Structures are given as structure tokens and as C-alpha cells.
């Protein structure tokens, strides 16, 4: 059983606000290997360690009734601090228990229930008015018998004992103890009932997830109880053969979550009877459609949670077209023709733009927003050591810097502190610029304010960019046309060697950079650390708050259109992103820019 199902019951259907979907019919038993038994530190039963074991599963209905029984029992006991251990003993009954019943309570039961009470396995029943105890007994053992008592001092009525037996017969309970599977997800904590949390501390607890990361859908218990969600983002880049293999292997264990799935994905899902659960998360959204003016053919369509008036003011403002497009993409998500449309700054001049309000289904789902909100709350409440770090992974040209700048400015403006800024950001290119200054013996910043100026200085080239550009030149890749006439694969091996050499350098690597950074005067309490890849974060400061930013447009087209950066050509930058893309794995929780900006109440710089 698990904490969540005990707390909320297991009604079939998607749990609101999450991607959790119970199976209609769960497996009757699961087989656990030693690697599946990641025990919590509060585990009291060690008999299962290093052993392969088969356990029976409780259905959703049984877990719901059992959880309700625990909660009602605790409600009758008030705020007693000691009922958790004794209640867990009674529910598990993995060792011999002594149960003392008052004669009047026993006689009030039906004959069948009296017989049931007396025949409970692993329970010794004694009918008596009082329980004599010696002075050496612990204080909890001196609790009087009426309305009934089990060893350890917690009272339970015969009717409660009968009800529990009807829900979960003692004969069916494992002699080695009941396992409590811990989902350990921060965004689910508010759903776990306090009584279940207290009682679960005294069960054999096995973790099936880690806060800051997703559930382990390969774990036998999760695989038996829940369907694994497949969002449009998860399969958008899979070739058809790989998609077919994924659905074939996961038949009976997967479901399509939300909308925005490509027709081939829907067709493939139907072939393997994989259910599709729509997600109506917003009653209405503002839809921005781009049409070719002559044919009136839709080129792209985005939906935004911002009000129509806000979007119209943005589009009618005097901001440059490129800046308008950046804001629009950061405030919305794509709904046509794909999850990553190809957009350029000229789209406003060559297309007709139509803004409307529509009842629209959410096209993209992310599970990282609660983790970001939790991190912000921790920084403001000073519950974690300074600096509290959040890592944001995303491709080049995915608006990481734009989003973090807006968030930091808004958060600092709304949480003034006499000690300085509460929040700060470290650009994904800041490390490369620092290395450039190190190798050129330039004067390094001595305060956070000076560092912030340095990382935003476009005249300082990143050492990583310079090295990658030199590799391209060395192999004769100087013009974009060279990508059609030469084999770009020769660049990847040298990219890899240089990249690892740079980030792991003992004196100028990432660890040395962060050691220097954390010594600066005026360091904010919370830092958003940007990263291009999963590989880099192994050298970052430790944190459990790691998110992946989902780009909602084709980043390659943006790299091709935007101005070349100092120290690197467009060709080299595009090849660098090709290399980085292979080092990003969808391990961590994802988040959309529009979700972050909306929650932080960030709006475009236009007059209302």
C-alpha cells in the first residue's frame, strides 16, 4: 500500500493537478528484487533486505477503506502522540498482540463477531474489567482496558477490530510485515493525510520516488498501480519505429496525457489500446494565430493564459518585432502545427495576426512548476542554507536567460530585503566568460554586483564558444554551406574531448568557478543556475531542485536568425547545440516559460 491511496482513496481516473492515473485493474501481486527495495531510514523491519520476495497488493478500494479506518481511529484518540506505533502494530499484526476487552463490550457484539474476535490469528484475546500492571511497566501499559486495549496502551473497540478484520483480514497479512511504499513527491505532500504520515513512520517503508525527480515508473509497485503518462513532449522527436517499439513494450502500462499529440502518435496508441486522457486545465485561453495573408492558411497558433487585452497591447506596442516574438513565446505555448513551430522575427510583417479567446485544452503539461514554487518559498522563508540553488537546463536560444532575468527582477521587487537581493541568476555562458578572463589574466569581479555586470557584458566572449569555433575552423567548417558538403560528424568527437577538458579543469573548471562565485560579497540567498546539458550539473553545487525548460519553438531557426555572438560563428553555434542536444536527457521535471512567468505575475513592458 502507499500513503497517497490510503489518504485519498483510489477512485479510477486522473488525479486533479497531477499526471497520476490509477489502473482500472491492478495486479494482484508483484515480485520485488533487492534493487526495488530502497528502504527509508525509518524502516523497522530489515527481513526483506537483500532478498527477492513476492508480495500481494491491496486494491484501491481496500486501501481507501483502510486509510479511512486509520483516520477515524485517530480522530477518536485526539492528539495522542503515541498511537502511531501501536496502531501500526495492530494493522500489521506481524507479531503476537495482546488484546484486552471489557465483558460489557464483548457481550454487545453479535455471536459471529465475538467468535471472529476470539479467532484472530496472532492476537491473544482476554476478556477482563481491568488489566493489572506492575510498577515497572512503561506508563503507556497502565492505560485501563475499557473500551479495549492492545499491548502498548492504545485503545480500540471490538467494533473497530471487527471492521478492520472485514477490510483487511489478519490471515491475509504478511508475517514479515506490511510494506508502505513512499511516493516522496513534494507536489503530492498536501494530499497525504497527517494521520497517514504519522502511522507510516512505523511501517516497513520503501521509496519509489525522490523529491525533485519523477516517480520511478519501472518500479513494480508503481507499474502495478499506475499508468505511466506519455505527454506530447515525450514522443515528439521519436522516429515512427521507436514510437511503435515504445508503445508495444508499454502496452497496458501507458496512457497518453493531455493534447497536442501528433496524428501518428494517436494512431499508434490506438493500435496498442493505449488510452488517451484529455486534460481540461484552463476554461479559456487567448489564442494568437498567424496566417499567410493571400491563402489565409494558418502557419502557427499559440495559446496564452494571459488576458486578451494584455496580448493585444504587446502586439500593438512599439517594441521591435524580435522582442515582441520573444515575449509572445515566453507567455504562451504552441497548439499548431507542432510543439516547436519555426518562427522568425519577420513573421509579424509577412503574416496576418488574429487574436481571439477560446475554450482550449492544455496542449503541454509540465510537472516542474510546484518544485519551482517550493524553491521560491524556501528561499524567502530562509529554510535552507544560503545560497539555495535551482538548476534550469535548456537548449541554446531557448530563452533561459530571458526568463530568469524576468523572474529575478520580479521576485526581488516583490521581496525587498535590507541585506540585498534575495534572488540572482547565473547565465549559462557566465562560466565561459569567467574562464576567458582567467586565461587572459583580467581583473575578476570581487562582488556579486560586478559579476552580474560581467555575465551580461556581450563584449566578453565565452571561452567555450571560442574553443568550439576554433575546432570548426580547424576542420574547414567556415560557412553554412559547408554543412551540406562536409561530414559534420568529425566535429563531435573533438567537441566532446574539449568540453570535458574545460568543465573538469581543476583550476579553471566548473567547480573552481562556483567556489570562486560563492565567495563574492553580496551573494543573493537564492540562485537560478542555467545549464545547457545534464553533464555540466554534475559539477554544479548540490541541489534537489533541477528543472528542464521546454522550448516552444524551433531553436535552430532562432540560432540561424539571431545576431552572431562574439567569439563564435552561427555555424559553430548550431553545431554546438547539436552536440549539447545529445547530452540532455529528460530525467528531470519539465517546466514551460509561460507557467513560470504567469505564476510570478510577470507581464510585458507595455502600458496597461
Curated annotation (Swiss-Prot):
Keywords: Capsid protein, Host cytoplasm, Host cytoskeleton, Outer capsid protein, Virion. It comes from the Viruses. It is found in: Virion; Host cytoplasm, Host cytoskeleton. The keyword Cell wall biogenesis/degradation does not apply. Its main location: virion. GO terms for cellular component: host cell cytoplasm; host cytoskeleton; viral outer capsid. Minor inner capsid component. Displays NTPase and RNA 5'-triphosphatase (RTPase) activities. May function as a cofactor of polymerase. Associates with microtubules and plays a role in the formation, structural organization and morphology of viral inclusions, where the assembly of cores and the replication of viral RNA occur. This is Microtubule-associated protein VP7.
